Amino acid sequence: MGRHIGGERLTDMFLLPLSPETEAGAIVALNRETEGNGLRLTHAQAEQLVEVRAQSLRRTGRIEFAPGRVECIIRAFCDSPYLSREDYVDTLSALIELFDTVKTETDDRISDAVLIEEMRAAFDGVCHGSLELLADEVISRVVRRANARGGAEWKMTEDT
């Protein structure tokens, strides 16, 4: 899947050339903001999230020109009452993958900031912390609605 040029996947050619080490360091630096909520990532866990992001980009065929989406997701969700130390990395991984899936399915009609804000509102609200509900019900409705409106401003509500 995906086009290749000279043995390299086309989407890989456009990834910003930040080293995984640099990206992981930026994620670990967020511990200062998340520790107050009892959430902390090790360097190995941060590297795992960098790899999840890279795999998600490849899977969806997306190209990322600016790093920082993982950090935005961490900042947005770190004070959720539904996050715990035990499932923090797994939850972040699922949110990263879901973010890329929605961006792809809506042809980028939703800005990153709006999508992250709406994911958080639904996660803490109608989904009560359920990633399955967020992915299966709410996000599918968001995708349908965003595509139907062609990207017009919208807010995710219980009746979305």
Label the model's feature ranges.
Residues 2-56:
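Short terminal alpha-helical segments
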